[in-house]
UniProtKB/Swiss-Prot annotation:
A Gene Ontology term for the protein's cellular component: nucleus
Entries under InterPro entries matching the protein: C2H2-ZF_domain, KRAB, KRAB_dom_sf, Znf_C2H2_sf, Znf_C2H2_type
PROSITE patterns noted in UniProt: KRAB, ZINC_FINGER_C2H2_1, ZINC_FINGER_C2H2_2
The protein, known as: Zinc finger protein 57
Keywords, comma-separated and alphabetical: DNA-binding, Metal-binding, Nucleus, Repeat, Transcription, Transcription regulation, Zinc, Zinc-finger
Role summary: May be involved in transcriptional regulation.
Ranges for domain KRAB: 4-76
Recorded family membership: Belongs to the krueppel C2H2-type zinc-finger protein family.
ZnF segments: C2H2-type: 140-162, 196-218, 224-246, 252-274, 280-302, 308-330, 336-358, 364-386, 392-414, 420-442, 448-470, 476-498, 504-526
Subcellular location: Nucleus
Length: 555
């Protein structure tokens, strides 16, 4: 019986060195070693692993030994080198052992000659690097922009920002992979193949490990519960990140603008706003994005893909998180409650935005005019006013819009769709915001109260307009004549005096109107509706103007 030693294949750690490795490095080491020995076992069924007084992988990871699979032990004498003892009957030649060793080296650690930027990346756990990380050093450097990173995984993510998500046509991705299974799964990141599907919600994944982790969100007990909002989590890391939303602990601070963030991922995304880097470009319309998530979300606007369906109402969504938030409408689950006014919300985003109505925080400021905004989406729409960028164009009338929300609302003026219906009176609405304001008429809920005169309002828009009556602020200025207005809608109507635009056209007689109010009054001429009645003569008129003129001449 001959023994084959794998010192030139496996990484040799002492037990003291092993104790210094973090969990991610241990997991990587375990996965590589297990696959290596599975591959070796497939070469010969008689493979056996022997150690004297050793500490096993199961002891280190707290896992039970499988009956179907023999897992190697760490040898004694303060070494984690592996020794293979196998019956070499039929395989006893020296050439066979040489070939076997070469085979294991190739399978275990594929050496990378250099990725697309010329740097070599070696993915084996390295104790020296680990000690550097502990000392606060950042040993991984990008050769393209010289940015340094603490972890290899961070460098790899950063490298993708230079090349985009996909390799150029006809070229293969040259990123280094430890073993064939990692290389195979990495290939899926380039092809976007996601063959592993969750049976509970339909979400798909590129790797079985991601699916296994996701399944726990459906089945596993959530042991970490937040005392403030009673939200529960599977993992301690997720729980810790959530707690920061209550404590306002923001450990990641931008040195350029001073903004602080709860999550490192959010901080990294923010840093790209200073560099202006947008590596993800849409092949359909040419629009570029800073983040891959935003790029993927945008792509679905072209494909119309909505793989996530609500089982209760049949509504479909492009994103799983949007489906989860939607499900709370059916369950009535409102996890986020405001301590100031008691209002509860189904989504964290809505809750954070609501809190700013109490604090007055407007973190998004326009560099051109100094105007500040509560929401990033509103800020982006405002910026397009300066750049005159109009991404959304109506195919029916040619009108263009700076925001998708305004564009969708405009489309409903053509289709007549009013998807929001009041359950109390049956009235329908084109906009969700208008619907919410209407509901408050029934509930008599008035969230916004003026400190100057005590008047209360059901909508923030009406409240903001009212405040301008006290301050005299008129932020909307006509570029042609310099006249200023309190409301943006008033400015739009005024601009039509200069352009002569008449967007409201009567389908019955072909007449066009500049203003929607004039158009409505005209429609009543066709329908015969007379909603304005004179109290003195009990005579009705189709519009308020005619009633007012009649009253002035007769009374």
């Amino acid at each position: 019986m001959d023994s084959v030693v794998f010192e030139d294949v496996a990484v040799d750690f002492t037990l003291e060195e092993w104790a210094l490795l973090d969990s991610a490095q241990r997991d990587l080491y375990r996965d590589v070693m297990l696959e290596t020995f599975r591959n070796l076992a497939s070469v010969d069924d008689g493979t056996q692993f022997k150690a004297n007084g050793s500490v096993s992988l199961q002891d280190m990871y707290g896992q039970e030994k499988s009956k179907e699979q023999t897992i190697p032990n760490f040898t004694g004498n303060n070494s984690c080198a592996y020794t293979l003892e196998k019956n070499c009957e039929g395989y006893g030649t020296e050439d066979h052992h040489k070939n076997l060793r070469n085979h294991m080296v190739d399978r275990f650690c594929t050496h990378n000659e250099g990725n697309q930027y010329g740097e070599a990346i070696h993915q084996m756990p390295d104790l020296t690097l680990h000690k550097k990380v502990s000392a606060g050093e950042k040993p991984y450097e990008c050769t393209k922009c010289r940015t340094v990173f603490t972890h290899l995984s961070s460098l790899k993510r950063h490298v993708k920002s230079h090349c985009g998500r996909k390799a150029p046509p006809g070229e293969e991705c040259k990123q280094a992979c430890i073993c064939p299974s990692h290389l195979h799964s990495h290939g899926r990141t380039d092809t976007e193949e996601k063959p592993y599907k969750c049976q509970a919600c339909g979400q798909t994944f590129q790797h079985p490990r991601y699916l296994s982790h996701h399944v726990k969100t459906h089945t596993a007990e959530k042991t970490y519960k937040c005392e403030q909002c009673r939200m529960a989590f599977n993992g301690f890391a997720s729980f810790t990140r959530h707690v920061r939303t209550h404590t306002k602990d923001r450990p990641y601070k931008c040195q350029e603008c001073g903004r602080a963030f709860i999550y490192p991922s959010t901080f990294q995304r923010h840093m790209t706003t200073h560099t202006g880097e947008k590596p993800y470009k849409c092949q359909h319309c040419g629009k570029a994005f800073t983040y891959p998530q935003a790029f993927q979300r945008h792509e679905k606007t072209h494909t119309g893909e909505k793989p996530y369906e609500c089982k209760q109402c049949g509504k479909t969504f492009s994103w799983s998180e949007t489906l989860r938030v939607h499900m709370r409408i059916h369950t009535g689950d409102k996890l986020y409650k405001c301590e100031h006014c008691g209002k509860a919300f189904t989504s964290s985003r809505s809750f954070q935005g609501h809190l700013r109505t109490h604090t007055g925080e407007k973190p998004y400021e326009c560099k051109q005019c100094g105007k500040a905004f509560t929401w990033s989406s509103t800020f982006r729409e405002h910026v397009r006013i300066h750049t005159q960028e109009q991404l959304y164009k109506c195919e029916q009338c040619g009108k263009a819009f700076t925001s998708s929300r305004s564009f969708r609302g405009h489309l409903r003026t053509h289709t007549g769709e009013k998807p929001y219906e009041c359950k109390q009176c049956g009235k329908t609405f084109t906009w969700s915001s208008t619907f919410r304001e209407h509901v408050r008429i029934h509930t008599q809920e008035q969230l916004h109260k003026c400190e100057h005169c005590g008047k209360a309002f059901t909508s923030s828009r009406a409240f903001q307009g009212h405040l301008r009556m006290h301050t005299g602020e008129k932020p909307y200025e006509c570029k042609q004549c310099g006249k200023t207005f309190t409301w943006s809608s008033t400015l739009h109507n005024h601009v039509r005096m200069h352009t002569g635009e008449k967007p409201h056209k009567c389908k019955q007689c072909g007449m066009s109107f500049k203003w929607h109010s004039s158009f409505r009054n005209h429609l009543r001429m066709h329908t015969g509706q007379k909603s304005h009645e004179c109290q003195s003569y009990s005579k009705a008129f189709s519009c308020q103007v005619i009633l007012s003129k009649t009253s002035e001449s007769t009374h």
